[in-house]
């Protein structure tokens, strides 16, 4: 039997609060109502509840720490309550009233189809301006030959004689705490509650076939990278006339060669010449809406950042926008001609670029302070 601490993903020194917190997280993750049609998740959910039934109780945990797995094979004592009772005590609030016994499924009840997840890559500009995109994906649909029954037309599926149509096998053991009953999926019908003797040739008894579906979705302005859009009812078809699942589209935004997005602001480096920085100049700044003129002030220093307000990314479902923040980078030419060189020398001499006395003193004082 698997270590109960490992099942709840905690160490043996974990506090009761840590055990409870981990149990809530795992139970929420693997709950059958979230993982509709996923038998592996359902079995994991049962396993988690079984582990918490022991470790969530101080006295039972103490005996488990003492006897380990042997506690399930011997002795008598106080009885176990149904795992679902523990779950129902506090998960109703989290899940809005999920049934505490929903894992004990009725195999003939309608089952919602499972959800589908796809990724959609879009251009940077499309994430800013919004767009419409076509998505093509594969989904499970009801078999058109057997109408989702799984049995060959003209035949019927029959009730499983091992589980009597419940899809569940009860395994009862005596423990130091009394009788312990654990439910598991019937291995004969695989939890379906029925057996198909003559399977539909088209779907091989599965009741569904794979179909490629194409739909159009609208990408809103300002959508974020990694955002998940849900399209209700476009997932896999349900079983026993259950409703279909949903389609979840994960948005992936391609990087832009020039712009970078930080929240709803656009940032980038803007190259300017030495003369533009010194003299000031009207420069053309690229924006999401086209070219914007900007008055660069005289004496602009390298790496100064300027802002174009409300020229950034639109906020979702809002008319407001972020800003554009561009940082000026002074480009130094690698080569200049003779005339340019002579003029630059004259300019340098006229500026007398030697540091004045006050500037020198200020620098020396700061260096001196570093070593005191």
Curated annotation (Swiss-Prot):
Main location as per UniProt: cytoplasm
Per-repeat ranges for CXXCXGXG motif: 143-150, 160-167, 186-193, 200-207
Zinc finger annotations (CR-type) as residue ranges: 130-212
Residue stretches making up the J domain: 3-68
GO MF annotations in UniProt: ATP binding; heat shock protein binding; unfolded protein binding; zinc ion binding
Subunit: Homodimer.
Function: Participates actively in the response to hyperosmotic and heat shock by preventing the aggregation of stress-denatured proteins and by disaggregating proteins, also in an autonomous, DnaK-independent fashion. Unfolded proteins bind initially to DnaJ; upon interaction with the DnaJ-bound protein, DnaK hydrolyzes its bound ATP, resulting in the formation of a stable complex. GrpE releases ADP from DnaK; ATP binding to DnaK triggers the release of the substrate protein, thus completing the reaction cycle.
Name of the molecule in the record: Chaperone protein DnaJ
Species this chain originates from: Finegoldia magna (strain ATCC 29328 / DSM 20472 / WAL 2508) (Peptostreptococcus magnus)
Higher taxonomy: Bacteria, Bacillati, Bacillota, Tissierellia, Tissierellales
């Amino acid at each position: 039997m698997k270590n109960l601490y490992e099942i709840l993903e905690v160490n043996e020194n974990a506090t009761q609060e840590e055990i409870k917190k981990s149990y809530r997280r795992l139970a929420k993750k693997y709950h059958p109502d979230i993982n509709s049609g996923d038998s592996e998740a359902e079995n994991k959910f049962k396993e988690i509840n079984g582990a918490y039934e022991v470790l969530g109780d101080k006295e039972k945990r103490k005996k488990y720490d003492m006897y380990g797995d042997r506690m399930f094979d011997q002795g008598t004592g106080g009885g176990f309550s149904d795992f679902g009772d523990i779950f129902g005590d506090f998960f109703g609030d989290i899940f809005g009233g999920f049934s505490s016994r929903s894992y004990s499924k009725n195999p003939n009840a309608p089952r919602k189809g499972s959800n589908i997840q796809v990724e959609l890559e879009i251009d940077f500009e499309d994430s800013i301006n919004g767009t419409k995109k076509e998505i093509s994906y594969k989904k499970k649909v009801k078999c058109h030959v057997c109408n989702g029954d799984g049995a060959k037309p003209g035949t019927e599926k029959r009730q499983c004689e091992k589980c009597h149509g419940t899809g569940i096998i009860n395994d009862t053991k005596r423990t130091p705490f009394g009788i312990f009953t654990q439910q598991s999926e019937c291995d004969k019908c695989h939890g379906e509650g029925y057996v198909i003797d003559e399977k539909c040739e088209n779907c091989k008894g599965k009741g569904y076939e794979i179909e490629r579906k194409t739909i159009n979705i609208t990408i809103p302005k300002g959508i974020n990278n990694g955002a998940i859009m849900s399209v209700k009812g476009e997932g896999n078809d349900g079983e026993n006339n259950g409703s279909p699942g949903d389609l979840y589209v994960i948005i992936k935004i391609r990087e832009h060669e020039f712009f970078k997005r930080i929240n709803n602001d656009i940032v980038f480096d803007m190259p300017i010449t030495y003369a533009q920085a010194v003299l000031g100049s009207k420069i053309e700044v690229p924006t999401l809406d086209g070219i914007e003129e900007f008055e660069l002030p005289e004496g602009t220093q390298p790496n100064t950042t300027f802002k174009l307000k409300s020229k950034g990314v639109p906020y979702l479902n809002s008319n407001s926008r972020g800003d554009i923040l561009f940082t000026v980078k002074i480009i130094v030419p690698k080569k200049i001609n003779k005339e340019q060189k002579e003029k630059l020398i004259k300019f340098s001499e006229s500026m007398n670029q030697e540091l004045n006395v006050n500037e020198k003193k200020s620098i020396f004082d700061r260096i001196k302070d570093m070593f005191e």
